[in-house]
From Swiss-Prot:
Keywords attached to this entry: ATP-binding, Cytoplasm, Magnesium, Metal-binding, Nucleotide-binding, One-carbon metabolism, Potassium, Transferase
Protein name: S-adenosylmethionine synthase
UniProt region (Flexible loop), positions on chain: 109-119
GO biological process, one term: one-carbon metabolic process
Organism: Novosphingobium aromaticivorans (strain ATCC 700278 / DSM 12444 / CCUG 56034 / CIP 105152 / NBRC 16084 / F199)
Localisation: Cytoplasm
Assembly and oligomerization: Homotetramer; dimer of dimers.
Gene Ontology molecular function terms on file: ATP binding; magnesium ion binding; methionine adenosyltransferase activity
Primary location: cytoplasm
Length: 401
């Protein structure tokens, strides 16, 4: 296992066009789950110049049944879309929450898919699709996330907070960040490069205003990344020059195109399935959450300093096909023993789709906040981000006492 290397991760802001699409899709998921906790949703969003299009499949009691929309339902969907765009902050000529065109092409879920997923008298609820999902944790940061991604997210979160508060009125919603760290002995010792590209108000690409923008970004970086890591950093701030046209007006956005930003910044494998726009019967989402939860608790319990967990499902089948643990030669016990310990935790109730949703409480409108700045490494707060809890630590320790 390599211990000395350079590694890089990137993040994108809430105003990035793909993230606008993710947030709209998850706002729709939340809308339907607030009406029916057992709703089925697969909502894809396209955003481009003054246009938002929804497409996908749904089933929701009291909202869409037997091929018909309930009175007022489509108006509520449109309001949810516009409110989401407004919250992000888009009031530009090329993309404005109030003036954009909205097209709704959501329709009913296939009965053939539903019959494989729904529980029946003779079977438990099946997985919503086949697939492999991964979870990961590392002790590099307090949130047990890869440091490169952790810092990339925090830079953009801080910039967005300053934009919303008015502290940085020259910022516009679209932005990207990228952080390269040098590792020695598997620990980050220096940030060798920081890249920040941010949409800005007119005039901030030259002269004194450009210098003001650059100094602002460097201040944010210095408040996010420890000074000891910034001694040899090269900064690349809006390296192409002007960035006035951005967001969906600059590039079309689609749901599910930032899956590495959403997860571990390339530090861990990814099964390929996106999260946003999907209700929690879709194991692309719920199983990725449970594997993060398990990996995080393994590291927090002191059983390893790094942990990757894979799980696999078949559509319509409730029990997982496999569970795989890899502690990357950092484990204090055998990886196979950790697998056995996980399967032996009674309060989990198993790793079926329904057991996952029940244990984590996923049938709730909790998803829009996940759709920007990462699904993982966030603070568990009430119903939100329950997969970040550390309530299996004692169970895992007890298994090896």
């Amino acid at each position: 296992m390599r211990t000395d290397y350079l590694f890089t991760s990137e993040s994108v802001s809430e105003g990035h066009p793909d993230k606008v699409s993710d947030q709209i899709s998850d706002a729709i998921v939340d809308l339907f789950l607030s009406k029916d906790p057992e709703a089925r949703i697969a909502c894809e969003t396209l955003t481009t110049t003054q246009l938002v299009v929804l497409a996908g499949e749904i089933r929701c009691k009291g909202v869409y049944e037997n091929g018909e929309w309930a009175p007022g339902a489509q108006d509520e969907i449109e309001k949810t879309v516009r409110d989401t765009v407004k919250r992000i902050g888009y009031e530009q000529d090329g993309f404005h929450w109030e003036r954009l065109e909205f097209i709704n092409r959501l329709h009913g879920q296939s009965a053939h898919i539903a019959q494989g997923v729904d529980a029946a008298d003779n079977k438990d609820e099946g997985a919503g699709d086949q697939g492999i999902m991964f979870g990961y944790a590392t002790d590099e940061t307090p949130d047990l996330m890869p440091a490169t991604l952790y810092y990339s997210h925090k830079i953009l979160e801080r910039m967005a907070a300053d934009r919303h508060s008015g502290a940085a009125p020259f910022l516009e919603p679209d932005a990207k960040s990228q952080v390269t760290l040098r590792y020695e002995g598997s620990l980050p010792v220096a940030a060798t490069a920081v890249v920040v590209s941010t949409q800005h108000a007119p005039g901030y690409d030259e002269g004194g205003k450009e210098a003001e923008l650059h100094e602002y970004v460097k201040r944010v970086v210095a408040e996010v990344i420890p000074p000891v890591l910034l001694r040899e950093t090269k900064y690349y701030i809006n390296p192409t020059g002007s960035f006035e046209i951005g967001g969906p007006d600059g590039d079309a956005g689609l749901t599910g195109r930032k899956i590495i930003v959403d997860t571990y910044g390339g530090a861990a494998p990814h099964g390929g399935g996106a999260f946003s726009g999907k209700d929690p019967t879709k194991v692309d989402r719920s199983a990725a959450y449970i594997t993060r939860y398990l990996a995080k608790n393994v590291v927090a319990a002191g059983l390893a300093t790094r942990c990757t967990i894979q799980i696999a499902y078949a559509i319509g089948v409730s029990e997982p096909l496999s569970l795989y643990v890899d502690t990357h030669e950092t484990g204090t016990v055998g990886d196979d023993k950790i697998e056995q310990a996980i399967l032996g935790i009674a309060k989990l109730g198993g790793l079926t789709p329904r057991a996952i949703r029940t244990h984590l409480g996923l049938n709730k409108p909790i998803y829009r906040p996940t759709a920007a700045y990462g699904h993982f490494g966030r603070k568990a707060d009430g119903d939100f981000f329950p997969w970040e809890r550390l309530d299996l630590v004692d169970d895992l320790k007890a298994a090896f006492a």
